[in-house]
Amino acid sequence: MKKTLISIAVSITAMLPALSHAELTSEQQQQLEGIHQLLSDNPEIIADLHANLQQYVENQQQLTKAKQQSETWLNDTTIHSVTGNPDGSTVIINFTDYNCPYCKRLDNVLAKMAGKNADLKVINIYVPLKQQVIDGLETNSAAFAIKVWQNAPEKFAEVNRLLVAKPGLHDKTSIEAVAKKTGTEEYLTGDTAINESLVKNYKTFVALGLRGTPAIFIGDEVIPGFIPYDKLEEIVKKHQAEQKS
């Protein structure tokens, strides 16, 4: 029971940073009064709640710092591939892995949305958690895709589509088949700079507090895991409306 009360209080109090920048609505005022009443009725949770809130504040500060430090890196499209409009003003940062089934589902959602929204720019940050090395190749699916993007961007969309289309893990046969079909065999070679960029992607992923793929950032919102098209469409429309206001 004590843990439940602490969890509730932390969840409500987590809204405080946002509330500090705006006039309180009647609902928000009621929620704040609820916090006070909760603590008054259950004083035994105050010490634990205080510790939890301190940890929450520290985590938020670390996340803010990590976002600021990684902003230039995450938006560098000379390194990271783009789905949609490279000049779009609505930007989604997509942490993804070609060997992750939920990532592939989300990549299809993002591609569909980019096809219907001319101002949408999806920057793909590859984090190959499931497979760093493929037997018999000098590369892997992420490194191959990046090399195509950097050297033959006109071929990237089809390479990406085929990499996403394969169920399960990629292997030497599947990667070579994609390369042959798209005329990109020359990009199956290893590349030290690209490998280093993948390492930096992973370090950024961890610094941002992410623990799995897929995960997307849109504005200040972080969405972990798969999200269906209709839900993502609502978020994108809301973000675009805020951009215009």
Where in this protein do the model-derived segments appear?
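Extracytoplasmic/secreted proteins, especially bacterial periplasmic and envelope-associated proteins
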Residues: 30, 34, 41-48, 105, ...
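Aromatic-flanked redox-active Cys/Sec active sites in thiol-based oxidoreductases
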Residues: 94-100
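Structural alpha/beta surface segment adjacent to cysteine/selenocysteine redox centers
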Residues: 93, 104-180, 206-211
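C-terminal cap of thioredoxin/glutaredoxin-like
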Residues: 23-28, 33-37, 178-245
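Bacterial N-terminal signal peptides that target proteins for export
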Residues: 1-8
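N-terminal targeting signals for export/organelle localization
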Residues: 10, 14, 18-72
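The canonical Cys-X-X-Cys-His
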Residues: 100-106, 216-217
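A short beta-strand-turn-helix
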Residues: 73-90
